[in-house]
């Protein structure tokens, strides 16, 4: 008889490579979901979504009645295994991607063996002890501190300098992206929650992960998020900037699903970027430019950089390869009264931003599949 738990393990390993503790992972999943529920999970397509009526048809052909289907599917939603949300044509289902599936296990408040397993899994990823998907396309991209996006200066009549807004697009502005989404919820930061569980709490705020639309609907149904209005969401963004956290958003245009606020001490996106490995997150469309002004207090602006891209010894040195264009140093320098000693300018080349979340994840899945095959041929684990 087919072992669906082994199939689930292979599904995880497809995305993140060999798990550090497969035996405990399997034990935890056996405590979390039943084989009957996993049958429903594997009826969903590998990527993309499926309409409820089509999924019901598949279940019926497999001998699962309507009442039993909804019971099993509801449990999978509660456990973060699948997503269920409304579309104009009715309810729609999709597998939670590996990140989503892992996040929900950690966000569950009960202290269970599976929660501890997934917290250790996340901690191992943050520490670089396990590999990540061999994709080239970043899952997320940085959004700069909004007040630092003034655009370039250009000359107009009467010899006056004004800011040119043409370089700044709505996809660069966090508050504009948040206000464009009809449904917003806030959840605990997955990374910091995991670190807290394993005894590595960094002290940064926990309730900072913004989710939208389908993802927000799924988390709200599972009781793992809190619905908020646009004003509170924007306030959370501003509070996170004051904390020195970096905004990361889905690397896609159109509707967004998540906006993370990451710290360099606990969050995987910054950890991977600092180690210069993998492609979990990409930089913003901007990079730092230094005016050349000799200001001793610039040393205070250097300290806030989450990437160690700045150094000061009488003059400022910028490592543009490490600068992710978050704008935290620019914001700090302006607070200290140094004007435009540092400012953000458009980056010459930045990672491609995909047209939609669906297109983004299809591309990442293709790249991961090819990368895993290549790694296997080369004998890599």
Predicted regions and their residues:
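A short, conserved structural fragment
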Residues: 74-88, 310-311, 339-342
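Catalytic cores of enzyme domains
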Residues: 129-287
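Long, low-complexity, charged/polar intrinsically disordered regions in eukaryotic proteins
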Residues: 1-27, 251
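Flanking helices and flexible, charged tails adjoining ferredoxin-like Fe-S electron-transfer domains
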Residues: 320-381
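Short acidic, hydrophobic short linear motifs in intrinsically disordered regions
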Residues: 47-61
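Ferredoxin-like iron-sulfur electron-transfer modules
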Residues: 31, 61-64, 93-95, 246-256, ...
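Short, amphipathic alpha-helical interaction segments positioned at domain boundaries
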Residues: 90-130, 367
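Short amphipathic alpha-helical interaction segments
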Residues: 62-78
């Amino acid at each position: 008889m087919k072992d669906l738990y082994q199939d689930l393990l292979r599904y995880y390993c497809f995305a993140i490579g060999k798990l550090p503790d497969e035996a405990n992972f399997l034990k935890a999943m056996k405590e979390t979901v039943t084989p009957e529920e996993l049958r429903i999970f594997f009826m969903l397509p590998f990527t993309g979504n499926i309409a409820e009526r089509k999924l019901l048809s598949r279940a019926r052909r497999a001998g699962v009645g309507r009442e039993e289907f909804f019971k099993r599917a509801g449990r999978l939603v509660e456990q973060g295994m699948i997503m269920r949300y409304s579309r104009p044509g009715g309810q729609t289902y999709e597998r939670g991607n590996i990140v989503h599936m892992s996040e929900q296990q950690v966000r569950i408040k009960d202290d269970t063996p599976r929660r501890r397993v997934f917290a250790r899994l996340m901690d191992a990823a943050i520490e670089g002890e396990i590999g990540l998907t061999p994709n080239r396309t970043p899952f997320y991209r940085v959004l700069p501190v909004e007040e630092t996006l003034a655009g370039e200066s250009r000359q107009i009549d009467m010899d006056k300098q004004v800011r040119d807004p043409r370089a700044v697009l709505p996809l660069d502005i966090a508050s504009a992206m948040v206000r464009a989404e009809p449904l917003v919820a806030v959840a605990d930061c997955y990374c910091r929650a995991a670190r807290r569980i394993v005894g590595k709490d960094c002290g940064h705020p926990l309730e900072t992960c913004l989710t939208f639309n389908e993802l927000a609907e799924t988390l709200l149904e599972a009781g793992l998020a809190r619905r908020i209005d646009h004003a509170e969401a924007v306030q959370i963004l501003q509070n996170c900037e004051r904390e020195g956290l970096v905004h990361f958003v889905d690397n896609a245009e159109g509707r967004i699903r998540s906006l993370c606020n990451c710290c360099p001490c606990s969050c995987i996106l910054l950890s991977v970027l600092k180690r210069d490995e993998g492609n979990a997150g990409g930089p913003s469309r901007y990079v730092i430019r230094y005016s050349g002004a000799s200001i001793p207090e610039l040393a205070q602006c250097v300290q806030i950089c989450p990437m160690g891209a700045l150094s000061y010894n009488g003059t400022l040195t910028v490592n543009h390869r490490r600068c992710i264009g978050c704008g935290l140093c620019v914001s700090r320098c302006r607070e200290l009264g140094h004007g435009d000693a540092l400012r953000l300018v458009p980056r010459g080349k930045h990672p491609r931003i995909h047209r939609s979340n669906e297109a983004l994840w299809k591309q990442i899945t293709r790249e991961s599949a090819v990368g895993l095959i290549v790694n296997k041929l080369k004998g890599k684990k």
